[in-house]
Amino acid sequence: MKIYKLQTPVNAILENIAADKSISHRFAIFSLLTQEENKAQNYLLAQDTLNTLEIIKNLGAKIEQKDSCVKIIPPKEILSPNCILDCGNSGTAMRLMIGFLAGIFGFFVLSGDKYLNNRPMRRISKPLTQIGARIYGRNEANLAPLCIEGQKLKAFNFKSEISSAQVKTAMILSAFRADNVCTFSEISLSRNHSENMLKAMKAPIRVSNDGLSLEINPLKKPLKAQNIIIPNDPSSAFYFVLAAIILPKSQIILKNILLNPTRIEAYKILQKMGAKLEMTITQNDFETIGEIRVESSKLNGIEVKDNIAWLIDEAPALAIAFALAKGKSSLINAKELRVKESDRIAVMVENLKLCGVEARELDDGFEIEGGCELKSSKIKSYGDHRIAMSFAILGLLCGIEIDDSDCIKTSFPNFIEILSNLGARIDY
């Protein structure tokens, strides 16, 4: 895919940003904890979340779908499927399903694409094995495909050494099948969509005031079925916020965006860098929702070292902002970037250099010198949707060819359509 330099300003109101991926995954998986029909409007129709629907279908759920409205009728009992459960490119789907299936009697095989099957799963499989789960796979159950033989699990008191919503949610799901009360704690607060949704479903879970500790009781009855409207994804919206900032005389308003405090850290970073950006809350139900207004801005360099778990998905796009800011910027304490869909530290630095930007890898992040003269280049996405979309936005300034853009469909199927509607010229 080739993105040509955009010569005109962008002025738009965007209401069709992709639905939130994290909430879509959880809606589908958590429906298996109920016994009645679950309904979601604005479900994300991307490859990752459609794969999750297929997984729960193979576990016995009945699914009705009309456009982005999805109804799920859970099975009375989870089936032991006669096929591999394909998670595609989604680490969220795989890690959450490991936790869910570990305590269900049956035999299950989870696999994914070539990128997912090389991402670390021991952070989930190890603590589950310690409480009685039987999980088998390459490199001591660190790499998929993974085979899970569901067992009754022992209660646990688990302290996570990493701040990860995926680890947290997997352990919560396993705790529901344990033989007694379980506790979970983490070193810093990760995304809390699971807690928010499960509390709305009347799950037997208690959260400490600071959000760092959980007490989870085994399930004694089905949870309350869901009927929700899924807001739009702030991680997906971020690309078009960035576009408005870097393109002269541009302004964009984005509506129905999820504004959960654990999801807007990257927006706060842009504000600290000088971006003219406002977030307004319009609804506060089980999640905080609102609109974002942003316009062309001059950015200044910044050091980012806190709340990294809250901006891990936006880090590649933030690197683009760093490259266009005045002065040096850095991101540290972000070693988790090395085990995402790609090694995002290495890949961002490699590709930014190809575009004429001075960038340097750190063990746990990167340093970028802003204000370099950009040049048109061909970059590699390494199958990582966030790398591809970040450089597509940079391409609006200098023109860029991206070697694998199909990966964008895993999270944001109408990204190219929106980009084209804003005036971008795109060739395949």
Curated annotation (Swiss-Prot):
The active site is at 313 (proton acceptor). Keywords: Amino-acid biosynthesis, Aromatic amino acid biosynthesis, Cytoplasm, Transferase. Pathway: Metabolic intermediate biosynthesis; chorismate biosynthesis; chorismate from D-erythrose 4-phosphate and phosphoenolpyruvate: step 6/7. InterPro entries: Enolpyruvate_Tfrase_dom, Enolpyruvate_Tfrase_sf, EPSP_synthase, EPSP_synthase_CS, RNA3'P_cycl/enolpyr_Trfase_a/b. GO terms for cellular component: cytoplasm. It comes from the Bacteria. The keyword Amino-acid biosynthesis applies. It is found in: Cytoplasm. Its main location: cytoplasm. This is 3-phosphoshikimate 1-carboxyvinyltransferase. It comes from Campylobacter jejuni (strain RM1221). The gene is aroA.
